[in-house]
UniProtKB/Swiss-Prot annotation:
GO biological process, one term: photosynthetic electron transport in photosystem II
Biological source species: Pleurastrum terricola (Filamentous green alga)
Membrane-topology annotation of the record: Multi-pass membrane protein
Transmembrane region(s): 40-60, 124-140, 152-165, 207-227, 278-294
Modified residues (Phosphothreonine): 2
Binding, a plastoquinone: 214, 261
Record: residues binding chlorophyll a ChlzD2: 117
Cellular component terms per the entry's GO annotation: chloroplast thylakoid membrane; photosystem II
Enzyme Commission number(s) from the entry: 1.10.3.9
Modified residue annotations for N-acetylthreonine: 2
Subunit organization: PSII is composed of 1 copy each of membrane proteins PsbA, PsbB, PsbC, PsbD, PsbE, PsbF, PsbH, PsbI, PsbJ, PsbK, PsbL, PsbM, PsbT, PsbX, PsbY, PsbZ, Psb30/Ycf12, at least 3 peripheral proteins of the oxygen-evolving complex and a large number of cofactors. It forms dimeric complexes.
Signal peptide per UniProt: none
Catalytic activity: 2 a plastoquinone + 4 hnu + 2 H2O = 2 a plastoquinol + O2
Stated name of the protein: Photosystem II D2 protein
Amino acid sequence: MTIAIGKPEEKTSWFDKVDDWVRRDRFVFVGWSGLLLFPTAYLALGGWLTGTTFVTSWYTHGLASSYLEGCNFLTAAVSTPANSLGHSLLLLWGPEAQGDLTRWFQLGGLWTFVALHGAFALIGFMLRQFEIARSVKLRPYNAIAFSAPISVFVSVFLIYPLGQSGWFFAPSFGVAAIFRFILFFQGFHNWTLNPFHMMGVAGVLGAALLCAIHGATVENTLFEDGDGANTFRAFNPTQAEETYSMVTANRFWSQIFGVAFSNKRWLHFFMLFVPVTGLWMSALGVVGLALNLRAYDFVSQEIRAAEDPEFETFYTKNILLNEGIRAWMAAQDQPHEKLVFPEEVLPRGNAL
């Protein structure tokens, strides 16, 4: 009689082998999200560096070109494709470039390349935070918070131009290009008077205020530990005990404002809620602009201002400023439209 001792070998599938490799504990965690994040982030960043350093883009936009043509870090950009190309993906092997790399660069193919790979890289980074949080049994609030800048990127660089006539109306990837796009938004959409923009500003500036107050309050209420009780000398970075006094901080702000956060959970949730909600709201506003929705047009004031030259409000001044921005930008931005503005809508010296 023969007795077999031991367990039969279990056959592992290819999926289990890949899962074991990507989630293995190493210096830089890869994970399933890394299969999306690392290649797309590498290609997006590499495309941007290539575009701003070597590739000329006068063909498509006239806003900026490469360092080789005299631009600096502020003015160089990966420019958007021409308006005539609409929403084409501008694939290198597509009908526009037909496999010609130089032609692809000239047409603005790098912009769609950077925009799409950049969007997937940001999504991959958010999924990475989900994956690591799940593996170490944390809540996923980091990933949820990171969805806010992703929503802004996607709404500005993808959804807005999709709602317009082409990628041409998205921002180019550069510093001066982004500021120019902001002026464009104001001139053509009166963006600063949009309530979603107001909520976004409140979220970003409110978050900065909360961050400054929180940091200062923690520094103010550090427990003394030794003779040199300051931020940098008196504390062991691996100490297990509490570093600052929430009770003292609560008492301080109760005396200042009459109210204060009662516990750390509510305090830190509020610091999460303010900027994330603000960015989400601003992204919603940009989606509205993609559809050319108007917000807060005070038509009665415009009619009265047209009838009475003496009538002037902040709003009517704003309208004149927007007209000036449009007149200044349109000829360069949209030469194919052959726009001609009548005398009465052009900026009028000191009238502004």
